[in-house]
């Protein structure tokens, strides 16, 4: 019986952890606003601090970053003596520069409360070297490709002698290859692989294996992943010793869900020309106004094209920031920092570079203008909202017709989406025409936007044709006129997919292309010079090589048609041979053959069912931080 007045400790209270956390860590956590541990933190931190390898799967916004940072810091500060100069005690590997930067930022906020480590955060003067200290402290170094050279990284390492490295795989491998960087068993304590499935998706498997080969086997390892696929399982077998698996799921009425309970996932059925009017209606009607929103497009070229068009039509209170994988590293970092630091309503216009790994705080709304090519990415896009218990809304725009099959397709994968009903989003053809006219006005004002639109539309069609759910997203079903108008194009581009299309490629826009000018005077002058030279050179005569290359160009759909025709012919020949074989058999032989066929079909169905269940469990459980 409990003693009167004695209060039972909340198992998710930070001071209830065993082993207990240092007082300064409790102060740091309190300052960050984390009153209680999330389930993944409560499950992971005690095990990881207590000499266990861990494999952690959890839904998005579950607080995984602190789940490994706290144990790593505690391990380094509980050593019997400081780590030797130029020896590494811990490494955290991240798949992207942005995520590595965020992890380092959270670590810096944490270490600001530990006086010896906070002192090490101050940059050294030119030529000054970090003095050895008898006091235990954490000295970190962030390694990012594209921002510094490997030589600069090594120079900084030798100058600061960090004991904790946070890095992307390629740059880490380059540093570990130096004879001046040491990771012996006597010094090295812990390795963390964050977003392990993403590391493998991005093709870092060879780099990871080389990194593991340079580290001592006697170490603690934490693997954090949205899902433990077969490839991730291989890393687990090679790199971890008897790990404890921690899987944190969200219970729903229909069983386990792959997303937080605070996230509403919805869809709207809109033809292409109504997508942007529906977006503006959604942004205007939501109450309270979403402070941070993310809009997903399928390609980098589409982001570059639509950014100036959306800036011209968005409600005035919304700022727009773009981010995609083809931006130079400094531009990506600048734009990302601008979006995160924004205090007024801001929209991030992006591709799947922001679908995983970017821990963007307080995202209210996610809108998917284009469904992702990989169905797995759908979950991770949605998961940017509704993090850490905060309410969030995700809306995907689907075209009426075959794309509606995407709804049951997602439900099979434990990702149910519902029709968005409140507030009611209604658009009209007239409203769509007015908006398209405003966007087209921007395009007509600068030929550079025309060029961007042509490239972006071609890249979008290619992305659409490569969709993994190819039976749902079919190029053959696209309405080219509606799409061209939705994109505010003034001409449909020359592309193989439109070769046999007999519609109006001018979209009804009367335009003298010879007088269609660039805003940039230098580009416009160059265009006119080139046009004059072409006029003086006489009629264009293609070379034999150009003619041959033109003949080789085929639409994706045509290639598939040829493959299908070959497959059909093979199938017909196979059936004919089978009929001839059966004609030569006795009745008894036919009966035995039919019995074997039934058994084989039953076995195939059993394997298929098991495969579907396994895929649903493995591919769609959890999100990344």
Swiss-Prot record:
- Spell out the CDD domains in the cross-references: DEADc_DDX55 (cd17960), SF2_C_DEAD (cd18787)
The listed location of motif DEAD box is 194-197
**An example Gene Ontology CC term for this record:** nucleoplasm
Enzyme Commission number: 3.6.4.13
- GO biological processes: assembly of large subunit precursor of preribosome; maturation of LSU-rRNA
> What terms describe the molecular function in GO for this protein?
ATP binding; ATP hydrolysis activity; RNA binding; RNA helicase activity
Q: Which UniProt keywords apply?
A: ATP-binding, Coiled coil, Helicase, Hydrolase, Nucleotide-binding, Nucleus, Ribosome biogenesis, RNA-binding, rRNA processing
Residues of the Helicase C-terminal domain: 278-436
For this protein, what reaction is catalysed? ATP + H2O = ADP + phosphate + H(+)
Q: Where is the composition biased (Basic and acidic residues)?
A: 553-570, 577-597
Q: Does the keyword Nucleus apply?
A: yes
Domain (Helicase ATP-binding) ranges: 45-246
The yes or no answer to whether the keyword RNA-binding is present is yes
Q: Which Pfam families match?
A: CTE_SPB4 (PF13959), CTT_SPB4 (PF23681), DEAD (PF00270), Helicase_C (PF00271)
Q: Where is this motif: Q motif?
A: 14-42
UniProt comment concerning the protein's domains = The Q motif is unique to and characteristic of the DEAD box family of RNA helicases and controls ATP binding and hydrolysis.
Protein name as it appears in the record: ATP-dependent rRNA helicase spb4
